[in-house]
Design a protein with these regions (language model features):
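Conserved ABC ATPase "signature" region
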Residues: 33, 40-58, 110
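Conserved signature/switch motifs of ABC ATPase nucleotide-binding domains
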Residues: 61-64, 82
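Catalytic Walker B motif of ABC-type/P-loop ATPase nucleotide-binding domains
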Residues: 87-90
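Hydrophobic anchor residue at the start of the ABC signature
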Residues: 12, 76
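Short coil-to-helix segment of the ABC ATPase nucleotide-binding domain corresponding to the Q-loop/switch region
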Residues: 22-30
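Helical segment within the ABC ATPase nucleotide-binding domain
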Residues: 101-115
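Signature (C-motif/LSGGQ) region and adjacent switch/coupling loops
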Residues: 5, 25, 51, 59-62
């Protein structure tokens, strides 16, 4: 059996947690500190990931010197530095403004194309799901059950394309057709 080079999974959530006393590259390298990897190798990998997530030139910046989008990139880098096979993302861009969020969508699509990994992305934003996902699973309101599954057969990039706009409208209409929780009780 081949030896796995990366960790099985990593997470990235809406909580953009950075250690305020660490610079960006040290915050990214934090994900590797629990193992026996030498410090020089941890920093080498962290620097490579800093470049991958578009933070080249900001390696030595402290969190208070970074914008919200840049801190999101640090969090994404920390999730990627261990080379996970599965990346679990729980609304990682929900706190970002629309322009930064769109930029992060493009970055995630680019990174996904470069790395062979599965991404499980949780979002309440239908447009975000259409832009990022190859497969969408829509959940019902309480109790949460799979309501619909959709194979997204649209080429990347999708932002603003007619197919993405049409699928977003279709999925929103499907959500609006679900009876509200109040009507069912």
């Amino acid at each position: 059996m081949p030896r796995l080079t990366g960790v099985a999974s990593a997470t990235c959530s809406r909580m953009i947690a950075c250690c305020r006393w660490r610079v960006a590259v040290q915050n990214v390298a934090l994900a590797l500190e629990a193992g026996s990897m030498p410090a020089s190798e941890r920093l080498r990998r962290a620097r490579a990931v800093i470049d991958l997530v578009g933070l080249g030139g900001f390696e030595q910046a402290y969190p208070h010197q970074l914008s919200g989008g840049m801190r999101s990139r640090v969090a994404l880098g920390r999730s990627l530095v261990g080379e996970p096979q599965i990346l679990l993302m729980d609304e990682p861009f929900s706190r970002l403004d629309a322009q930064t969020r769109s930029s992060m969508h493009r970055e995630l699509v680019r990174i996904h194309a470069m790395r062979a990994m599965t991404i499980l992305f949780v979002t309440h934003d239908v447009e975000e799901a259409v832009v990022l996902a190859d497969y969408i699973v829509m959940m019902s309101a309480r109790p949460g059950r799979v309501r619909r599954a959709v194979d997204v057969a649209l080429p990347q990039p999708r932002i603003g394309t007619p197919g993405a706009v049409a699928l977003t409208a279709e999925l929103r209409a499907s959500l609006e057709a679900e009876p509200s929780q109040e009507a069912r009780t």
